[in-house]
Structure formats: C-alpha cells, structure tokens
Amino acid sequence: NGTRYESATLLCENLEEELKCQARTSMLMGSGAMLNLALDAKANQDKMKTVINWGNNTDVTYGGQLSAVTRFFKTDGKKPILQADIDVLPTQIILNDSVWNIRPSHLALDSGRVFIDNFLVERPNQYLRIDGKVADKETDSCLVNLKNIDVKYVLDIVRFDAVEFSGQATGVVNLKSILKDFTMNTHLNVHNFAENSGLMGEADITGAWDHELGGVRLEAQIEEENLSATHVTGYVSPKLKGLDLMIDADSTSIALLNPYLEGIFSDLNGRVNGFVRLHGPFKALDFEGKVSAAIDAKVDVLNTY
C-alpha cells in the first residue's frame, strides 16, 4: 500500500512450554516523521498476553501502550467454533502531548462477531466510550459516545486535510451492520467549531452514511450567539475523494475562505452574507456563490489594504 519501513526484526522462542514473540519496526509517515512500533506476545496453553508499544520522534508526542490478555476456547458439538475472551488492561497513551487513560474493558470474539463491553479512553473532562457489537446484522449496533473530543485529532488520525476543521465534539455515533451493509448515524454538538482556523461558533451536526456516495451526508447549524448563523448541507466522500457543501452564511466569518483566496488577498478579516458552494476533489477544492461582505484585506498584487 506504499507504506515505507526503515527496518524490522522478529524473534520467536519456545521455552518451558511458553511461546514468546517480539516484533520491532519503524514506519516512515507521510510527514517524514518516524513511528516506532513494538509488539511483545507470550502464549501458554489457551492464554496469550499481548503488549503493543508505539512512539514517534517529533516535537509533539504521540505514543503509548496497549495491553491485553486473550483466552481461547472452543464450543461443544460436532463442529466446534474457536472463540476468544479479551481483557483489555489499564494503560496510558499520549496524543498531542496529552495523557489519556485506557480503562479495563472486555471484548469477546464469537462466530465472526465482536462484542465490546465498555471500552473507555479518558482524561479529565474528555472521553471516548465504545459499547456494542461489530457484526453483520442490521439489529447489531455499536455506540460510540464522545465528550469534548478534539475534531482535529480525529481528522489527523484518518489523514483528512482537505479542509481544516477543529472544535470539541460531544455526542453519539451509532454504527450498525458494520461487517455487511454498514450504516452510520451521528448527532454531535461541537464547541468552538472552526473551519480553516475561522471560528464559526457552536455547531449542531447530524450525519448519515450514504452507500452510493461512500461517504457522509451531513447537515449543520452553527451559531455565534448574537453575532452569526451558518447553515451547511452536503456530503464528504472518501470514496469519491471529494466533497460538496452548500453554505448559507449570515454574518459568517470570512476566515473560512482564506485558503482559497491565497495569492489574491491576505490578512483577510470580516463577515459575509449569502450562499457559498464549496466543492470538488479534496486536492483541488473550489468555491462559488453570491455573497455580500464587509471585510478588511491586503491586496497582494498591489501590496496595499
């Protein structure tokens, strides 16, 4: 898949009826940073303990440890099925220099289904909690609960940088039939929502997965109290590698358009009213529309304000 590795080692030993394996590698990230990965596993009879460590080499730290104990067993009958119980152990991870606690939780693997019982990653006044089933039936759902999760963290992890979004998201993501006809519905409130570093206010966002688009159709109402209101509808599609958003602006900060006006204007500040369509492939987004604006800006070609 184009991922580059600097080096890798694998060592396995079978001592005193215990199998030990160690794996080490360094992965080159797109930014040029190096991500170091290490896996240690010990297996004895029907039990295996696994520890995964990782860390980067940049000024901002991303790293940590995942640890779990897995017990394997088979069902009774003529066609026994291999199953597994996984106890996630308490550890810590570091995201953007912030320490997060992974709390004890339980997972079970049964006939191609994964049961998740209260998987929790948290720090003061922030958490991500997962409960439910990863399976192929429409009635099988998995709930992801968020509290004050930084939107930018999530987008950095999935390497989405076509548009810069930020803010602290609280709400629920409902995933169904994950292994077959995947559906997703979400309702999030985002505090201090910003687009392209332009603060837009408090956002109420609903979204649903669209199979044909291979992406999310969304609707958002964003307000700065007694100052502005912005209504957004459209979609973001990883499958099509593009987006199409209709923005109804009422005294909305013009800062959200800054990246698309580079080379024409700079130091752009002010408010806009009207309709803007932001659309196109992620790597070549364009905008069009009709707006009225009260702005201050530097005209680069004239070097004047």
Language model: regions and residue ranges:
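Interface amphipathic segments
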Residues: 1-305
